[in-house]
């Protein structure tokens, strides 16, 4: 059978729950069919489902597939064999794990991001301005540790979430004769989903290229501050990039992590910002989740992620100055 970019011999691919008997098979030959894949792995145990993923347009194999054993012990047998070859090509079987759901964007919050502040604006100016909308619990500006000058952006926390709605509805505000932009602050979990946060500490100097690519020249180094783990920043927050869909946060974070690992910049893209079609995590590289609701929720264990095209950052560490001293 052939449907939704896959070709299999039995079973259903619509079950997104983790199946301990399910394996991701990478490195398949273009000639490998579900039948030949089944024939090879049947020597390890009874196979409940077998499929080769295909491009929905060209119908060509995408070079990977899935095999689900009736007995999870068969997976150990496969992994216990150091070398696997099928159709004169070395293949790479791995345990398939469900892909975690991406955190949703926060719609109700007490904290806002304020960007585009003038150089002479101090934290008291920011607090005084926003108090006209409601009680301010805290206000802070982000400072460069080297120059001890603020970088043109900060955060304000209100006592009431409704105040945030009112402030962000206006969007642009004038403080000290300069228009500033206000956005809802987003938890770090949105910026760096679980599994990438451990490497997020390496991002400050690689994400600058991304920030510049998004046109955020007015307040660079934002991610260098939030996600750096400075004392008192609990929870950390990120800025909701203008015009950037929430669904894209996962691939961007993955690409940034790949950049932190040492990927070079993309010479075809000035500023180091990846193209619109740059691949995301391995599941996106092999095909969008929409092709198959069950398969799209799986990734292979320890499979590499593609490079991102992010360049190196340009600025140094930041520190925060807050209206209250709870952040120092």
From Swiss-Prot:
InterPro entries: MSI_RRM2, Nucleotide-bd_a/b_plait_sf, RBD_domain_sf, RRM_dom. Pfam families: RRM_1. The modification Phosphoserine is found at residue 6. The modification N-acetylmethionine is found at residue 1. Induction: Up-regulated in astrocytes after brain injury. The modification Omega-N-methylarginine is found at residues 228, 261. GO terms for molecular function: identical protein binding; mRNA binding; poly(U) RNA binding; RNA binding. Ubiquitous; detected at low levels. The record marks 217-218 as: Breakpoint for translocation to form MSI2/HOXA9 fusion protein. Keywords: Acetylation, Chromosomal rearrangement, Cytoplasm, Methylation, Phosphoprotein, Repeat, RNA-binding, Ubl conjugation. It is found in: Cytoplasm. Residues 1-28, 264-286 are annotated as: Disordered. GO terms for biological process: central nervous system development; regulation of translation; stem cell development. One of its GO terms (cellular component) is intracellular membrane-bounded organelle. Residues 21-111, 110-187 form the RRM domain. RNA binding protein that regulates the expression of target mRNAs at the translation level. May play a role in the proliferation and maintenance of stem cells in the central nervous system. PANTHER family: RNA-BINDING PROTEIN MUSASHI HOMOLOG 2, RNA-BINDING PROTEIN MUSASHI HOMOLOG RBP6. It is linked to Chromosomal aberrations involving MSI2 may contribute to disease progression in chronic myeloid leukemia. Translocation t(7;17)(p15;q23) with HOXA9; translocation t(7;17)(q32-34;q23). This is RNA-binding protein Musashi homolog 2. The gene is MSI2.
């Amino acid at each position: 059978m052939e449907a939704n970019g896959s070709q299999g011999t039995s079973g259903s691919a619509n079950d997104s729950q983790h199946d301990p008997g399910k394996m991701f098979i990478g490195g398949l030959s273009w000639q490998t069919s579900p039948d030949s894949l089944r024939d090879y792995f049947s020597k390890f145990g009874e196979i409940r489902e077998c499929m080769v993923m295909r491009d929905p347009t060209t119908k060509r194999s995408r070079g990977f597939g899935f095999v689900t054993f009736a007995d999870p012990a068969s997976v150990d047998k496969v992994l216990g064999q150091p070398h696997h070859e099928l159709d004169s090509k070395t293949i790479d079987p791995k345990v398939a794990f469900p892909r975690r759901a991406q955190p949703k964007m926060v719609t109700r919050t007490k904290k806002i991001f304020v960007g585009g502040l003038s150089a002479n604006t101090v934290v008291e100016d920011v607090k005084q301005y926003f108090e006209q909308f409601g009680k301010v619990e805290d206000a802070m500006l982000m400072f460069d540790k080297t120059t001890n000058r603020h970088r043109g952006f900060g955060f304000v926390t209100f006592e009431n979430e409704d105040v945030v709605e009112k402030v962000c509805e206006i969007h642009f505000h004038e403080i000290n004769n300069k228009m500033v932009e206000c956005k809802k602050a987003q938890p770090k979990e949105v910026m760096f989903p679980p599994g990438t946060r451990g490497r997020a500490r390496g991002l400050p100097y690689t994400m600058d290229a991304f920030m510049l690519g998004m046109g955020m020249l007015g307040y660079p180094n934002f991610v260098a501050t939030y996600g750096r783990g400075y004392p008192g920043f609990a929870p950390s927050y990120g800025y909701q990039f203008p015009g950037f869909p929430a669904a894209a946060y996962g691939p961007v974070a993955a690409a940034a992590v790949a950049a932190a690992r040492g990927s070079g910049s993309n010479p075809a893209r000035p500023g180091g910002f990846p193209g619109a079609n740059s691949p995301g995590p391995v599941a996106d590289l092999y095909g969008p989740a929409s092709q198959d609701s069950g398969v799209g929720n799986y990734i292979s264990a320890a499979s590499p992620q593609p490079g991102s095209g992010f360049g190196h950052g340009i600025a140094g560490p930041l520190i925060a100055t807050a209206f209250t001293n709870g952040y120092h």
